[in-house]
A protein has these predicted regions:
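N-terminal localization/anchoring segments of enzymes in phospholipid and broader phosphate metabolism
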Residues: 1-537, 555, 559, 571-727
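Hydrophobic alpha/beta core scaffold segments
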Residues: 562-566
């Protein structure tokens, strides 16, 4: 990237943050700075064209969720606690919202420029996204034919200009048209939820992509032949998603699934927090529309970038338009039936998406088929639409294992999927429980219990990411599996508490939030503070905004401890501020895969302590969620985690460094490659062997009581269903 472009990137990333005199950065503005880094990937000429288009899609999707959740929360705060300032930046809710809206408009200008450039490059590569403002006669004739194909799927509703608008669902696209003859004025509301987002045809080797919303808008007079279409626009409403179970009246039977379903219905009907308009309306028409939507002008964004860019998936073209293929390595060196024997002697670390998640699925099947296995207990937060892990758990229950699934029904925007899976797993014979009333269970924790004669042994897995094979190929995550008995006992104690609706107790080996995570984190930071200039801290996480943790990191810096923070997203602490954070560095990697793993490292050499787990350094992870962390204690797993940290240190392609003013820049020059590419090469080629000699002796096990498994009921006809799922 040229020096001028880097300077522009620096300016765009920093000028919208809190004032330099504050050591802390407003959370919402820090998140917008992260999403800007995503948008900058869409502008990077080194990124293949269709991948740049994908980053543009991700940017818009991220922003929609941000408005639904964070601006929804801020809107409620502005109403309920308007005088309560943000403890980090001192900004009041209304001021925060105003600044977010300003920054969003600023970023929109960059988004428009990027889209224009991508569109031109697509055309040069044989994929023409039609512009109905300047369309050729042949393209218009072909488009008219496509319009005829979908015409019967369109269901316009026409109302008098003085009537209330019908309800516009969040995230759905509508065409709003103003109709009139003489003094009679009407409105047409046309939902597009029944038609595909795009269509296409080919002329002389050029693929013509027809976005359905502009297509229907262009041919609207053909649909409304009896009406006089004066003007029209494409409209999308983003509604507040800040709805909680506490907002839903209790049901007599206290059925949590029903309460969550009711909450989802309520969420769909919340007030708008943003409106997007594609197409120009006259000022009076625009004002009337916003009045009917009850949305202020400040919340409205007129854009020329299509709302839906999913047409990317239909574009062919040369291989150079996409990233080189990088498939997760399926073979990690173990065959089916070898996992238990290997893990009993060695801890196993897996790194996604460089390695496949299927070996973990194989482990569940091996447990299902092992006559010595008594039980499988697992926490489930987000699963794929057709989950291989859910099928493996169902299979295990059908084989007579006691399968306990803690399913968090409140995983935002995955609630319905989790409701469906809770019913399916119950039908399979699994015991299904839910999260705690005041704490979401966000941990990625699994424990498999076996009985050899009169002795029990356990295999425990802790992960940084969801048990989801789809996101397992899109996010960087880690999974650590061990047969250490103290880890198994801690995991069992955590599940025992959760079954009883209690917060898991402080653990001996694992860190279990909310009781163990922050205290252990603070203790180890204090340990490094005591070492002064010899102290070392390296943390890879997705976000940092907890004041107590940030103040402790400032103490580390003031004591001379070298602190490296690899924070993908929100980072509310400014590095390099003299007298405060001059020994702290902050960097962020945005690349091909979404950085999602968490590594906490304290010290170096033989004294280094290394942990992985599911939680970031946000208030919610430290205080309002159940999270699980496990220490890497074997030389092999520690070496692999240090490889990850070293790759991040050496990244000169996708890493951006945070400056004291809160802006982010890419380092110029120097040797180094993309950390993700380096780690793909390392982990995809890495294999273990069941024939490896046993690892160093494990700590002495804590005595345990024998476990009596509860028999699982099997519904009739389930075997036939299960065979169809896993075949």
């Amino acid at each position: 990237m040229a020096a001028k472009e880097k300077e522009k990137e620096k300016k765009e990333g920093g000028e919208d943050l809190a004032a330099p005199e504050s050591i802390f950065v407003n959370r919402e503005l820090s998140w917008l700075a992260f999403n800007l880094r995503v948008l900058q990937e869409a502008a990077d000429p080194a990124v293949p064209l269709l991948e740049r288009l994908k980053f543009l899609m991700i940017y818009q999707s991220n922003l929609a969720e941000f408005y639904r959740v964070r601006i929804g929360i801020m809107t409620h705060r502005a109403i309920l606690t308007p005088d309560k300032a943000d403890p980090l930046s001192g900004m009041l809710p209304e001021a925060t919202i105003a600044e977010v809206l300003r920054v969003t408009r600023e970023q929109q200008a960059l988004m428009e420029s990027i889209w224009k450039s991508i569109r031109e490059e697509l055309r040069a590569n044989g994929a023409d996204v039609l512009d109905f403002k300047k369309i050729s006669k042949v393209d218009e004739l072909m488009s008219k034919k496509l319009f005829g194909d979908i015409r019967d799927l369109l269901d316009p509703r026409i109302i008098d200009i003085n009537q209330a608008l019908p309800f516009l669902w969040s995230g759905e696209t509508y065409i709003i048209a103003f109709l009139g003859r003489g003094t009679e004025q009407k409105l047409c509301i046309l939902p597009l939820n029944r038609v595909p987002a795009y269509l296409s045809f080919e002329i002389d080797g050029c693929q013509k992509i027809v976005l359905t919303a502009p297509l229907v808008r262009h041919f609207l007079p053909l649909l409304l032949k009896k009406e006089n279409v004066l003007q029209s626009a494409i409209v999308e409403v983003t509604r507040n998603a800040d709805v909680f179970l506490s907002d839903v009246q209790d049901h007599a039977d206290d059925d949590l699934r029903q309460k969550v379903s009711t909450m989802l219905t309520k969420r769909k009907r919340e007030m708008p927090v943003r409106v997007r308009i594609y197409g120009k309306l006259t000022d009076p028409a625009r004002a009337l529309l916003l009045k009917k939507l009850r949305v202020p002008e400040s919340r409205v964004f007129t854009q020329n970038v299509p709302f839906d860019l999913s047409f990317r998936s239909c574009i062919g073209g040369p291989a150079g338009l996409r990233y080189e293929e990088r498939r997760p390595a399926r073979d990690i060196g173990l065959k089916k039936g070898e996992y238990f024997s290997y893990i009993e002697k060695h801890d196993l670390l897996m790194s996604f998406p460089f390695q496949s998640m299927m070996p973990f699925v194989d482990l569940i099947y091996e447990a299902a088929d092992d006559p010595e296995v008594l039980s499988i207990k697992i926490t489930l937060y987000r699963m794929s639409g057709s989950s291989k892990i859910a099928a493996a758990l169902a299979y295990a229950a059908d084989k007579g294992k006691d399968v306990l699934c803690l399913l968090e029904l409140r995983a935002r925007f995955d609630e319905q999927n989790n409701i469906d899976y809770s019913e399916m797993l119950e039908d399979a014979g699994c015991r299904v429980i839910y999260g705690l009333p005041e704490h979401k269970v966000h941990s990625k924790l699994c424990v498999i219990t076996r009985q050899h004669g009169g002795n029990l042994s356990r295999i425990t897995q802790v992960g940084t990411g969801n048990y989801n094979e789809v996101t397992g190929e899109q996010y960087t995550d880690l999974s650590l599996i061990t047969a250490r008995e103290e880890a198994g006992l801690d995991a069992e104690a955590a599940f025992a508490a959760l079954v009883n609706g209690e917060i898991p107790p402080e653990a001996h080996c694992l860190w279990i939030a909310p009781l163990s995570f922050k205290p252990r984190l603070m203790e180890l930071l204090d340990r490094e503070i005591a070492r002064g200039e010899k102290g070392r801290v390296a943390i890879k996480a997705n976000a940092l905004n907890n004041v107590e943790v940030m103040e402790k990191l400032i103490e580390c810096s003031q004591a001379g401890v070298k602190v490296e923070l690899f924070i993908r997203g929100i980072c509310s602490l400014r590095p390099g501020v003299p007298g405060m954070t001059e020994n702290i560095t902050v960097s962020s990697v945005v690349g091909r895969w979404l950085e999602h793993s968490r590594i906490y490292s304290f010290g170096e050499g033989e004294d280094q302590r290394l942990f992985i787990g599911s939680g970031d350094m946000l208030n919610r992870n430290l205080e309002r969620r159940v999270e699980a962390f496990m220490e890497a204690v074997t030389p092999d797993t520690r070496e692999q985690l240090n490889r990850v940290l070293d790759a991040l240190r050496n990244d000169r392609e996708k890493s951006r460094r945070m400056l004291p003013d809160g802006s982010y820049v890419r380092d110029e020059g120097g040797e180094g490659t993309s950390s993700q590419e380096a780690l793909y090469r390392y982990f995809s080629a890495r294999k273990v062997s069941a024939a490896e000699p046993e690892a160093e002796p494990q700590p002495v096990s804590v005595p345990q009581k024998a476990e009596t498994p509860a028999p699982a009921e099997k519904p009739r006809g389930f075997r036939a269903w299960l065979r169809s799922v896993i075949s």
